[in-house]
Each structure stands twice: as C-alpha cells, then as structure tokens.
Curated annotation (Swiss-Prot):
Membership in a protein family: Belongs to the ATPase B chain family.
Protein name listed in UniProt: ATP synthase subunit b 1
Oligomeric and partner information: F-type ATPases have 2 components, F(1) - the catalytic core - and F(0) - the membrane proton channel. F(1) has five subunits: alpha(3), beta(3), gamma(1), delta(1), epsilon(1). F(0) has three main subunits: a(1), b(2) and c(10-14). The alpha and beta chains form an alternating ring which encloses part of the gamma chain. F(1) is attached to F(0) by a central stalk formed by the gamma and epsilon chains, while a peripheral stalk is formed by the delta and b chains.
Membrane topology: Single-pass membrane protein
Disulphide-bridged cysteine pairs: none
Function (record text): F(1)F(0) ATP synthase produces ATP from ADP in the presence of a proton or sodium gradient. F-type ATPases consist of two structural domains, F(1) containing the extramembraneous catalytic core and F(0) containing the membrane proton channel, linked together by a central stalk and a peripheral stalk. During catalysis, ATP synthesis in the catalytic domain of F(1) is coupled via a rotary mechanism of the central stalk subunits to proton translocation. Component of the F(0) channel, it forms part of the peripheral stalk, linking F(1) to F(0).
CDD domains: ATP-synt_Fo_b
InterPro entries, per database record: ATP_synth_b/b'su_bac/chlpt, ATP_synthase_B_chain
Organism (species): Brucella canis (strain ATCC 23365 / NCTC 10854 / RM-666)
Keywords for this protein: ATP synthesis, Cell inner membrane, Cell membrane, CF(0), Hydrogen ion transport, Ion transport, Membrane, Transmembrane, Transmembrane helix, Transport
Amino acid sequence: MFVSTAFAQTATESQPASTAGEHGAADAVHTETGVAHDAGHGSGVFPPFDSTHYASQVLWLAITFGLFYLFLSRVVLPRIGGVIETRRDRIAQDLEQAARLKQDADNAIAAYEQELAQARSKAASIAEAAREKGKGEADAERASAEAVLESKLKEAEERIAAIKAKAMSDVGNIAEETTATIVEQLLGLTADKASVSEAVKAIRASNA
C-alpha cells in the first residue's frame, strides 16, 4: 500500500493535536479529582473522632499507660514503700520503748504499794505503842507517817503520769511525721504541721 506525501504530512500534523487533546482531558480530570479531594478533606470529621485513627490512638494510649505504670512501679511506689517501712520500724521501736516505760511504771506502782503496806504496818505498830506512851505523841507520829506516805504517793503518781505522757507524746509525734510524709509522697504537697497534728489528735480522741 502506497501513502502519498500529502497524507503522511496530514497524519503527522494531526497526531500532536490529538496528543494535546488527550493531555488536556487528563489535566481536566486531575483538576476535577483534586477539587473533589479537597472538598472531601474540607468536610471531614475531627481526627480524634475519625474511626480510621482509632487503632493508632489505642496504641499510643497503651504506650502512655505502660510508661506511666513503669514510672509508678519503679520510682514512686518503691519510695513510698521505703518511707512507710522506715516509719513502721520506728513506730515499732517506739511502741516497744513505750511498753518498757509502762513496765517501769507498773514496777514503780508495785514498789509503791509495797512501801505503802510497810508504812501501814509501821503505822499500826506505832499506834499500838502510842497507847502506852500517850495519845498525843501517837497522833504526832501518825501524822508524820501519813505525811510521808502522802508525799511518796504524790511522787509516785507524778512519775507514772510523766512516763505515760512521754510514751503517748512519742507515739503521737511519730504518727504526725508518718502522716505528713505519706501526704508529701502521694500528693506532692507540703502538709501543714498544725493540720496534721489536729487530725492525729482527733483520731486518737475518737479511738480513746
């Protein structure tokens, strides 16, 4: 088949025009798609509420929770546990000391009762002798003996009260320090000593 020169030239000239038309149509389609795509983005939902992002949000939530849990278990909780354990040991030691002081007080009471019994026995013997020496002299000796007994009784009571007060004061101070430390470790706040003291006193009064 023979192709004339004029036909070949016409075909060559028409090919670029056809190509240009195809490119123009493609650009038009791309432009329309881009407009539609932008319109779709403009009317989209808020990203945190977009269901396509749920997986990544759950993943980051799990990672954040895991890091927070590690921080609590490795840093915060061991420190709080150490403080509580130290305070617990100190309270146990102070309670043991308070028990010893109470034992000393009981021993002092027993000694006082023994001395009182001896004094009463002596007073009885003095009274018996007074019947022979005279009523006046017996009354004087009895008054002297009773004064000595009263003095010893008062001294013993003051000693017992001081021992008990010291023991309760030590326990109260330890409770206040422990409460203030726990508040500082858990809440990161500096506890008011007056408020802590009032709270501890209120608890002790309710348990009394």
